[in-house]
Swiss-Prot record:
UniProt entry keywords in alphabetical sequence: Amino-acid biosynthesis, Cytoplasm, Histidine biosynthesis
Comment field (misc): This function is generally fulfilled by the C-terminal part of HisG, which is missing in some bacteria such as this one.
Subunit structure: Heteromultimer composed of HisG and HisZ subunits.
Protein's UniProt name: ATP phosphoribosyltransferase regulatory subunit
Broad class of the protein's primary localization: cytoplasm
A GO term from the CC aspect: cytoplasm
GO biological process: histidyl-tRNA aminoacylation; L-histidine biosynthetic process
Taxonomic source organism: Clostridium botulinum (strain Okra / Type B1)
Pfam families per the UniProt record, alphabetical: tRNA-synt_His
InterPro entries associated with the record: aa-tRNA-synth_II, aa-tRNA-synth_II/BPL/LPL, HisRS-like_core, HisRS/HisZ, HisZ
Pathway in which the depicted protein is active: Amino-acid biosynthesis; L-histidine biosynthesis; L-histidine from 5-phospho-alpha-D-ribose 1-diphosphate: step 1/9
Function: Required for the first step of histidine biosynthesis. May allow the feedback regulation of ATP phosphoribosyltransferase activity by histidine.
GO molecular function, one term: histidine-tRNA ligase activity
Location in the cell: Cytoplasm
Length: 422
């Protein structure tokens, strides 16, 4: 029988050294953006009861969840998203809090990928949720925070596409169409397959207004700049659909007033499989990654499943895809802190240790050498990316080697500190 002790499960990944450092830097930067935008971080358990995610509007199908059992036979899951846990926490622990709540998180989620197409089963996510207000101000706040988060990472040439969940719902609510056909219709529209859409609409037996039919037929083409809104309005008299279009227009205008409209485009063909979102929906894209790197929107019906009715909006960033995009754009964020290796004669251990602690307090990465041979120390330092080797070999000045310039000097401690702070 084959042993699997040297393998990891499909969809999982070891993250090592440089890549790990980049991932942590990205997550730290996102945390700073959230913190200075007034969001408070929460941490939820990796394992939740299946019932947390078992509702008729859950965005994640149950077959996509990793399941296990506790000692009482109750079904548990590795959390497949963070929105439901935040809903649970809000409904059970935050009823007396001051609203609106501004929450943020950075966590791994887990989803089964049966297609084995290279997608991860463990996904690093980072995002925010604004809970307790249903005006467009909170939608704008969420979208603007998403834009600023991506900008803070140095990401180039990204776009946030805006849609509206209520728009498609308004166009189809009076159609007599089977559930499986509606699901197929949504898929065709998402794929922007105009030919297949026309054929599908001609074949199904439904009652719909001529205007709504024409608008649905044109949904794959209705994406681009803000002018798309007026084009769509000209194709329908559906009052609910027109209200949805007005919402998108007003959100866009607010973002335009802030000066961030260059990052926004409109996609009225953005539809969802399950009626999870209730208002504006948005996704972030960059050329270097095929899938969306960010997704979010308004979901006003979820938190009521946890004992309290509250509107909410937010987004989640896929940190793994952000890493791919930054790597391809050659804008990876690395630690710029200087790295120092200190070697010493045994009688100078205490002085070497004390100096190392002083350097650490100044945010200099520093370690004591575990090697004694000069050649081994030099080879280790070069492979590790050390900037300076410092040697405690006598009472007065210390040996200092700059590995970038290959220069050697003998300096006092204060002179070394000044050098490292440059």
């Amino acid at each position: 029988m084959e042993k699997w002790n040297k393998h990891i499960p499909e969809g999982m990944k070891d993250i090592l050294f440089k890549e790990s450092n980049i991932k942590l830097n990205i997550e730290d930067q996102l945390r700073k953006v959230y913190k200075y935008s007034g969001f408070s971080e929460i941490i939820s358990p990796t394992i939740e009861f299946y019932d947390v995610f078992n509702s008729n509007i859950q965005a994640i199908p149950q077959e996509k969840m990793y399941k296990l059992f506790d000692n009482l036979g109750r079904v548990l899951v590795l959390r497949p998203d963070m929105i439901a846990p935040i809903g649970r926490i809000t409904g059970t622990k935050m009823k007396e809090c001051t609203y609106p709540l501004r929450l943020c998180y950075t966590a791994n989620i887990f989803r089964v990928n049966e297609k084995l197409n290279g997608k991860r089963g463990e996904i690093a996510q980072s995002g925010i949720e604004i809970i307790g207000t249903n005006g467009i101000k909170s939608d704008v706040d969420s979208i603007v925070t998403a834009i600023n988060a991506l900008l803070s990472l140095g990401l180039k040439n990204f776009k946030i596409e805006l849609g509206e969940a209520g728009f498609f719902q308004a166009l189809t609510e009076n159609m007599e169409i089977k559930e499986e056909n509606l699901k197929k219709l949504k898929e065709i529209i998402r794929n922007k397959n105009y030919v297949a859409l026309k054929k599908f609409l001609d074949e199904i037996s439904s009652k719909y207004s001529k205007e709504d039919f024409e608008l649905i037929k044109n949904l794959p083409k209705l994406f681009g700049d803000i002018k798309i809104i007026e084009k769509a309005k000209a194709l329908t008299k559906n009052k609910k659909a027109l209200r949805s279009l007005d919402d998108i227009h007003n959100i866009y205008k607010s973002i335009e007033n802030i000066g961030l409209e260059a990052y926004i485009s409109i996609d009225l063909g953005m539809v969802q499989n399950i009626d999870y979102y209730t208002g504006v929906i948005f996704k972030g894209y960059v050329e270097e990654v095929g899938d969306s790197i960010l997704s979010g929107g308004r979901y006003d019906n979820l938190i009521q499943h946890f004992g309290i009715e509250l509107p909410a909006t937010g987004f989640a960033i896929n940190v793994d895809d952000i890493m791919i995009a930054l790597k391809k754009q050659n804008t990876m964020s690395m630690d710029k802190d200087k790295k120092v290796l200190i070697f010493y004669k045994e009688e100078f251990l205490r002085k070497a240790y004390d100096f190392m602690q002083e350097l650490k307090m100044k945010k200099i990465i520093c370690e004591l050498s575990l090697l004694d041979d000069d050649k081994e120390i030099l080879l280790y330092s070069k492979k590790k990316g050390i900037d300076f080797i410092i040697g405690f070999m006598g009472e007065e000045k210390l040996f200092v080697k700059d590995l970038k310039s290959d220069k050697i000097a003998f300096l006092k401690k204060d002179e070394i500190e000044n050098l490292l702070m440059l």
